[in-house]
């Protein structure tokens, strides 16, 4: 299994099988019980790298960093090998550039790649990001 993780406050974890096929996507609040069950089968995980963004408040920047640290701790505790990946690196070649990269094109791409994934709503852009990160993880770390 391969994991893609969007560590945002409303982030998600996506799971792909060894063939790169969709298994599930789990919202942040529900992750801990799922990762306990999956940990032994995970080959590799990619965690989106976080950094302060212009216009982002101090509190939200802190929360974003705190969530990233939480994820790193969970992955290490369950002995899941992982790397961090910059948004530009996982988006390259997957998300079409329309001026500035936005979350909506990523959602559209993920819906096409993973039609069985629950990505019905616009607010599911974090799930979409996690799926695309998992896709890159599978491509780079798989077989």
Residues covered by each model-derived region:
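Phosphate- and other anionic-substrate recognition elements at nucleic-acid/protein interfaces
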Residues: 1-143
């Amino acid at each position: 299994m391969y994991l893609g993780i969007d560590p945002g406050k409303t982030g998600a974890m996506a799971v792909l099988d060894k063939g790169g096929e969709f298994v599930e996507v789990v919202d942040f609040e529900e992750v801990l019980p799922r990762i306990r069950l999956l940990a032994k089968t995970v080959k590799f995980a990619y965690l989106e790298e976080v950094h302060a963004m212009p216009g982002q408040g101090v509190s939200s920047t802190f929360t974003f960093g705190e969530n990233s640290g939480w994820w790193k701790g969970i992955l290490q505790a369950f002995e899941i090998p992982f790397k961090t990946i910059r948004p530009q690196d996982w988006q390259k070649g997957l998300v079409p550039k329309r001026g500035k990269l936005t979350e909506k094109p990523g959602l559209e791409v993920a819906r096409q790649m993973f039609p069985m994934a629950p990505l019905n709503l616009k607010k599911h852009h974090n799930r979409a990001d996690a799926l695309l990160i998992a896709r890159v993880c599978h491509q780079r770390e798989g077989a």
